[in-house]
Amino acid sequence: MSNIPAELRFAESHEWARLEADGSVTVGISDHAQEALGDVVFVELAEVGKVFGAGDAAGVVESVKAASDIYAPVGGEVIAVNEELADSPELLNEEPYGSWIFKLKPSNPAELDKLLDAAGYQALIGE
């Protein structure tokens, strides 16, 4: 059974989003997603300064099984990427909620309200 932290919001495409105190949004992939992917071997990170709309492809996670696009759960400008993943992509398997992929300055913070809460995500993945 997947771990689903109550304080996070989730996209149906299995990204999580956390609103930070400074108004930024931290993004990663869910425990369910990393389990489905298997051992992560490479993460293609977005460029800082790039602007995405909600649902835009914002990077790629490659595992021994597949390559999977990572989508921006909300629109905004990338203000940071987790460079640690370039050398240690397996961190997404080890700590899916501690290992973020990128941070956004959201263009419309209300988009977070359109994402699933923990219970909604749990229902989506059938757990």
UniProtKB/Swiss-Prot annotation:
Listed cofactors: (R)-lipoate
InterPro entries: 2-oxoA_DH_lipoyl-BS, Biotin_lipoyl, GCV_H, GCV_H/Fam206, GCV_H_sub, Single_hybrid_motif
Protein name, as recorded: Glycine cleavage system H protein 2
Record's keyword terms, sorted: Lipoyl
Family assignment from sequence similarity: Belongs to the GcvH family.
SUPFAM superfamilies tied to this protein: Single hybrid motif
Function: The glycine cleavage system catalyzes the degradation of glycine. The H protein shuttles the methylamine group of glycine from the P protein to the T protein.
Entry-linked HAMAP family: GcvH
SUBUNIT field: The glycine cleavage system is composed of four proteins: P, T, L and H.
Originating organism: Pseudomonas putida (strain ATCC 47054 / DSM 6125 / CFBP 8728 / NCIMB 11950 / KT2440)
Span of domain Lipoyl-binding: 24-105
PROSITE patterns tied to this protein: BIOTINYL_LIPOYL (PS50968), LIPOYL (PS00189)
Cofactor note: Binds 1 lipoyl cofactor covalently.
